[in-house]
Regions:
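Cofactor-binding active-site loop characterized by glycine-rich and histidine/acidic residues
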Residues: 50-171, 326, 343-344, 357-358
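N-terminal amphipathic, basic-rich helices that act as targeting or association modules
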Residues: 2-89, 246-270, 275-284
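Low-acidity, Ser/Thr- and Arg-rich intrinsically disordered low-complexity segments
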Residues: 460-469, 473-474, 481-499, 506-516
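A glycine-rich helix N-cap at a beta->alpha junction
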Residues: 93-108, 170-187, 205-208, 369, ...
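Short acidic, glycine/serine/threonine-rich loops at helix termini
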Residues: 84-90, 156-165, 187-192, 197-198, ...
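Long, well-ordered, tryptophan-enriched scaffold segments
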Residues: 2, 182-330
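Active-site nucleophile and cofactor-binding loops and adjacent substrate-binding regions
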Residues: 47-56, 75-80, 109-128, 151-155, ...
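Non-catalytic terminal/interface segments that mediate subunit docking, oligomerization
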Residues: 72-73, 286-402, 407-417
Length: 521
């Protein structure tokens, strides 16, 4: 709805960032509301990442008010929250109405779709490294454009983000990092860094004081002694006002936290960062799903939603009697075996619902581990558990397990450890596009020693089996059938409902399998 009943629509007038800049500040709340209305209308029909995008409406407007793409580079981590960016860079109207459909806007950002998409993405943790590379290239070329990395708080659970953070000050003096902190990745964020962000107590008091005193010191003639006094003051006052200064330990100037839905505050802080001669991190607090009651109440469900009723939040495809999804069949079987054997453990990377491990997390939280978006750690963690006679099961999407390939080879298979990988979302991912296709798993796993790779079987073969824990050193093997395709060749299971196969209540023996098991579903 518009802020005023008589106000003409603004969103249809936005053909690019210049039109966003041309609006009066008083018009921006109306634009934000129109964007939210459009997001809800389109995703309720097509599905998509509605929760993350509703949370970054004001932030994205502010970014395009302050910076000028495509000259300035905006790099969005994961890029699933790029819908608002698309609407503000000439991809609205009918093109956006076909979001995630043939001939329409993609669900992520791709350099081939628009010059405003500085870097393509679909996986988490990539923005800071890519932006740092762009900023360094700018410095080497002697150009002056701004580079901004927009990262969710979940990105800081990724090792690659911390690797980039460790290299920022040694690579460039001009980089802006926007930390979009909504306390969620897909599921609730976990780990020490998530706890740290929740505890940060920096207020506008410190930032205003810092700004005023900085101006005071700069009013004096520069000199070694004055610089020493200023540096000492800055360090000691920061320690007083801030519980911890993690980002400043890495050499970044910290600003925040900033209300991510206050356009004036966002623009002010972005403008300040734009003129800093040191790398800056702006800590922005946002509400995932803001503007849609169901998305606020159920942020995990509405992270990436199927078509839904915007009034009730219910899926429009939820048909009574529909067989369970394949991941739910897997999750139920794993929970049953975990109840029987306390050494059976489930591990996932920020996706308990998507991988089917929510039941295990609810019923046996002591046998469930969500390590955040850290697939390399997940696999190594499982390897360590396996050395002590535990039976870890890593449930990770096919496209995301690529990120831990070295750990699969070097740390699990070469040591012949009994780790099970359940690779969900094999095959084409349909609306999510090429960054999420599970096309490479069979190729990169069949060549690995000491691993048994299993896939779904033709309709005529047994629907699925679970291996004996004793004979397989307590490793689960699930094989779920697909519909017959007129061939005896195995076919990997795609995302969606199963064929309603009843689960066997007792395991069967498969003694010839290797300790490391990979289930491709």
């Amino acid at each position: 709805m518009n802020t005023s009943p008589s106000a003409p629509p603004l969103l249809p007038l936005i053909a690019g960032p210049a039109d966003v800049k041309a609006l009066a500040p008083a018009q921006l709340p109306q634009l934000a509301q129109e964007i939210r209305d459009e997001l809800i209308e389109v995703t309720s029909r097509n599905g998509g990442h509605i929760g993350p995008n509703l949370g970054v409406v004001e932030l994205t407007i502010a970014l395009h008010r302050v910076f000028s793409t495509p000259e300035d580079q905006l790099v969005f981590d994961v890029a699933h929250q790029g819908y608002v960016h698309k609407l503000l860079t000439g991809r609205g109207g009918e093109f956006f109405a076909k979001l995630r459909k043939t001939g329409g806007a993609s669900g992520f950002l791709y350099r081939s779709e628009s010059p405003h998409d500085a870097f393509g993405a679909g996986h988490a943790g990539t923005a800071l490294s890519a932006a740092l590379g762009m900023a360094t290239a700018r410095d080497l070329r002697g150009s002056t454009e701004h580079v901004v990395a927009v990262c969710g708080d979940a990105a800081f659970t990724c090792g690659v983000t911390l690797e980039a953070l460790n290299n920022v000050v040694s690579s460039t003096k001009r980089l802006i990092v926007v930390l979009n902190d909504n306390e969620w990745s897909i599921a609730k964020n976990v780990g020490a860094i998530a706890g740290y962000l929740n505890r940060i107590s920096t207020s506008q008091t410190y930032n205003k004081l810092h700004h005023d005193i900085e101006g005071f010191f700069k009013s004096f003639p520069s000199g070694v002694e004055m610089n020493r006094v200023y540096t000492k003051w800055k360090r000691e006052t920061k320690d007083f006002f801030v519980e911890s200064s993690l980002f400043e330990k890495f050499g970044l100037r910290y600003l925040g936290p900033v209300d991510g839905h206050n356009l004036d505050a966002l623009v002010k802080n972005l403008e300040f960062a734009k003129h800093c001669d040191v790398p800056v991190l702006i800590h922005v607090l946002t509400k995932k799903g803001k503007g849609l009651e169901a998305a606020v109440a159920h942020p995990e469900k509405f992270h990436g939603a199927s078509p839904y009723d915007p009034e009730t939040g219910e899926s429009v495809r939820a048909i009574p009697g529909t067989p369970p999804n394949y991941q739910d069949v897997f999750g139920a079987a794993l929970a049953r075996f975990a109840r029987q054997n306390p050494k059976v453990l489930g591990i996932t990377g920020a996706m308990p619902a998507g991988t089917g491990l929510s039941l295990l997390a609810k019923e046996l939280p002591g046998q469930f581990f969500d390590v955040g978006i850290a697939e390399e750690h997940a696999v190594l963690f499982a390897a360590g558990l396996a050395t002590k006679e535990f039976r870890p099961v890593c449930a990770i999407y096919s496209t995301f397990l690529q990120r831990a390939y070295d750990q699969i080879i070097h740390d699990v298979c070469l040591q012949n450890l009994p780790v099970t990988f359940c690779m969900d979302r094999a095959g084409l991912s349909a609306n999510d596009g090429p960054t999420h296709h599970g096309l490479f798993d069979l190729s990169y796993l069949r060549c690995v020693p000491n691993a048994t790779v299993t896939i779904s079987r033709p309709y005529s073969l047994p629907s699925w089996r679970i291996a004996s824990w004793a004979e397989l050193r307590s490793v689960i093997l699930l094989v779920v059938r697909t519909e017959s395709r007129g061939s005896n060749n195995p076919d990997r299971i795609k995302r969606g409902a199963s064929s309603g196969v009843a689960m066997m209540m007792s395991p069967s023996s498969l003694p010839d399998c290797a300790p490391t098991m990979v289930l491709v579903v």
